[in-house]
Curated annotation (Swiss-Prot):
Substrate binds at residues 125, 155-156, 187, 193, 259-262, 333. GO terms for biological process: glucose catabolic process; glycolytic process. This is 2,3-bisphosphoglycerate-independent phosphoglycerate mutase. Disulfide bonds: none annotated. GO terms for molecular function: manganese ion binding; phosphoglycerate mutase activity. Keywords: Glycolysis, Isomerase, Manganese, Metal-binding. Belongs to the BPG-independent phosphoglycerate mutase family. Pathway: Carbohydrate degradation; glycolysis; pyruvate from D-glyceraldehyde 3-phosphate: step 3/5. Its EC number is 5.4.2.12. Mn(2+) 1 binds at residues 400, 404, 460.
Length: 511
C-alpha cells in the first residue's frame, strides 16, 4: 500500500536546463550546493521539453506555455504553432471562416487591414511565417490598404536580429504590390503581461492613433536609429513609419501572436468596453478585431483558432478524486501554473487554491535577480507546514526571466537565489513527511552567449532539463515533460486517466 505523502510538491525551476559545464553556463558557474546535493543523493533523470516531445516542430525550442501545458496534461499536446503552420501548408488557413469574414467586412466598409504581431522566427509567441500568410491572404482577398504593425523580438531571438526580418517583409510588400510597415515597437512595450500599462500605452497610441515622439521614413532606418540610441530589438521605442496609418472606421485588425499571455493586454486595450488601464483617446468603429488564438475567454473578440479542449488534466483528475491542490508563483509565471498547467482553464478546480506573489517592479530582472523568491518561498513553506494540500505546483521564474536579459552575472545570482529557496522547501517537506519533484519547463540560463553571433544569448534552448525525486528509493528513467503528471499520480498512489499517455519517470523500489 502506498504511504500517504502530503504534500507532494512539484517545483518548476523555469529556464533551468541541463548542460555540461561551459564558460557561459550560469547554472554551472553558480554556487548551488542544494541542487548539487539533491542531484547526487536522490533518483534523477533528464526530460525533454522541446520539439516533438512537447508537440512543437522538431528542433523548435520549448517555452513556458508549452512546457506547462505538457506538464499538466500528461500527454503530448500539439501546439497552436504546429496547428497553424499545418493549416498554412495545407491551405485551410486561407479559407478560415473567422479570417475570411473579417476581411470581407473590411472590404465592404472600404476599410483597411491592420496586421499586428511579433515579427520573429523564434516560434515562442509567434512566427513570421504566419504574418506572411496573413498579408498574402489579405491581398488575395482584395484588401487595398494593408498595414503591418510589427513588434520586435530580441528576447527569443538574438538582441539585434530584426533587420533580416524587415528585409523579408519589404520584399514581400514589393512582390505583392501592396502593404507596408506602419509602426514598429519593441515587445517590451507592446507585449507586457504585468499590467505595466504605461508600456502598452506607448505602443497602443502608435498603432491605434499613429502617434509617437519617434518617426521614421522606413522600417530599416527605424531599427538602425534605435540601435544608435542604444536600444536592442526588445526595447525599441514605438516608431511611426512613414505617413501615419491610424485605426479608422471600417478597418479590421488581426493580432497574429498565437501565445496568449503577452497578447492579452494589448487586446484588452483594443476590445474591452470598460478598459481603464489608460486613456485610450477617440475610438474608431472597426469592422472586426481577430485574435489568432483565444487569448482569454473573457475577451469579446473572435479567435481564428479556438482552443481544443483537454480533458482530465492533472488538476481536474485530482479534483475528481477529492484531492486538494495549491498553485503558486510570482506574477511573471502565475498564468503558467494556473491557466496553462490546467490546459487553458481560467477558473480553479474544486479543492484548488491559487497564490500570486507580485513580481518586483523593475525594468528588467537583472536589476533584481532574486526577484520575489524569498516571499514566494515564505508562502510555500507556510503552505507545506499547514499540510492542507495534497499536491502543490510552484514555479520559480528566475532562471528564465533573468536569463532573458543576457546578463551573465545576474543569471548566476538568480540561480543561487533559487537554490537557496529549494533548500528551504526541501527542509520544510522533510519536517512534515512530504516529497518533492524538481524539474524545469525548458532551458535558458545554461547558455548565456551565442557562439555564432557573439551576442548575448537571451533565448530558450533545446537542452534537456533535470528531474529529481526527493523522496523514497526509486529507479529513474529519462522521458519528456508529459511524463511528469503520471509520475505525480504514481507517487501519491493514484491511477492515471486514459487520456494521459505519459508514463511515470520513477519506479518505486517497493513496486
Amino acid at each position: 500500500m502506498t504511504p500517504t505523502i502530503k504534500p507532494l510538491v512539484l517545483l518548476i525551476l523555469d529556464g533551468w536546463g541541463y548542460r555540461e559545464d561551459a564558460p557561459d553556463n550560469a547554472i554551472a558557474k553558480a554556487n548551488t550546493p542544494v541542487m548539487d546535493r539533491l542531484w547526487e543523493k536522490y533518483p534523477h533523470c533528464l526530460v525533454d521539453g522541446s520539439g516533438g516531445a512537447v508537440g512543437l516542430p522538431d528542433g523548435q525550442m520549448g517555452n513556458s506555455e508549452v512546457g506547462h501545458v505538457n506538464l499538466g496534461a500528461g500527454r503530448i499536446v500539439y501546439q497552436d504553432f504546429t496547428r497553424i503552420s499545418k493549416a498554412i501548408s495545407d491551405r485551410s488557413f486561407f479559407s478560415n471562416t473567422i479570417l475570411c469574414d473579417a476581411l470581407k467586412k473590411a472590404k465592404a466598409a472600404k476599410g483597411a487591414v491592420h496586421i499586428m504581431g511579433l515579427l520573429s522566427a523564434g516560434g515562442v509567441h509567434s512566427h513570421e511565417d504566419h504574418l506572411v500568410a496573413m498579408i498574402e491572404m489579405a491581398v488575395e482577398q482584395g484588401a487595398e490598404d494593408v498595414y503591418l504593425h510589427a513588434f520586435l523580438d530580441g528576447r527569443d531571438t538574438p538582441p539585434k536580429s530584426a533587420l533580416p526580418s524587415i528585409e523579408r517583409f519589404e520584399a514581400l510588400f514589393a512582390r505583392l504590390g501592396k502593404g507596408r510597415f506602419a509602426t514598429l515597437s519593441g515587445r517590451f512595450f507592446a507585449m507586457d503581461r504585468d499590467k505595466r500599462w504605461e508600456r502598452i500605452e506607448q505602443s497602443y497610441k502608435a498603432v491605434y492613433h499613429g502617434l509617437s515622439g519617434v518617426t521614421s521614413a522606413n522600417a530599416t532606418d527605424a531599427v538602425e536609429n534605435a540601435y544608435e540610441r542604444g536600444e536592442t530589438d526588445e526595447f525599441v521605442t514605438p516608431v511611426v513609419i512613414g505617413q501615419p496609418a491610424p485605426i479608422a472606421n471600417g478597418d479590421s485588425v488581426f493580432f497574429m501572436n498565437f501565445r496568449a499571455d503577452r497578447a492579452r493586454e494589448m487586446t484588452q486595450a483594443f476590445v474591452d468596453k470598460d478598459f481603464d488601464g489608460f486613456d485610450r483617446g477617440s475610438r474608431a468603429d472597426i469592422s472586426e478585431f481577430v485574435m489568432l488564438t483565444q487569448y482569454a475567454d473573457t475577451l469579446e473578440a473572435p479567435s481564428a483558432f479556438p482552443p481544443e479542449p483537454l480533458n482530465n488534466v492533472l488538476g481536474e483528475w485530482l479534483a475528481k478524486h477529492d484531492k486538494t491542490q495549491l498553485r503558486i508563483s510570482e506574477t511573471e509565471k502565475y498564468a503558467h501554473v494556473t491557466f496553462f498547467f490546467s490546459g487553458g482553464r481560467e477558473q480553479e478546480f474544486e479543492g484548488e487554491k491559487r497564490v500570486l506573489i507580485p513580481s518586483p517592479k523593475v525594468k528588467t530582472y537583472d536589476l533584481q535577480p532574486e526577484m520575489s523568491s524569498e516571499q514566494l518561498t515564505d508562502e510555500l513553506v507556510a503552505a507545506i507546514e499547514s499540510q492542507a494540500f495534497d499536491v502543490v505546483i510552484c514555479n520559480y521564474p528566475n532562471g528564465d526571466m533573468v536569463g532573458h536579459t543576457g546578463n551573465f552575472d545576474a543569471a548566476v545570482k538568480a540561480c543561487e537565489a533559487v537554490d537557496h529557496s529549494v533548500g528551504r522547501v526541501v527542509s520544510a517537506l522533510e519536517a512534515v513527511g512530504g516529497e518533492c519533484l524538481i524539474t524545469a519547463d525548458h532551458g535558458n540560463a545554461e547558455q548565456m552567449s551565442d557562439a555564432t553571433t557573439g551576442q548575448a544569448h537571451t533565448a530558450h534552448t533545446n537542452e534537456l532539463v533535470p528531474f529529481i525525486y526527493v523522496g523514497r528509493p526509486a529507479k529513474a528513467r529519462n522521458g519528456r515533460l508529459s511524463d511528469v503528471a503520471p509520475t505525480i499520480l504514481h507517487l501519491i498512489g493514484m491511477e492515471q486517466p486514459d487520456e494521459m499517455t505519459g508514463t511515470s519517470l520513477m519506479t518505486l523500489e517497493q513496486d
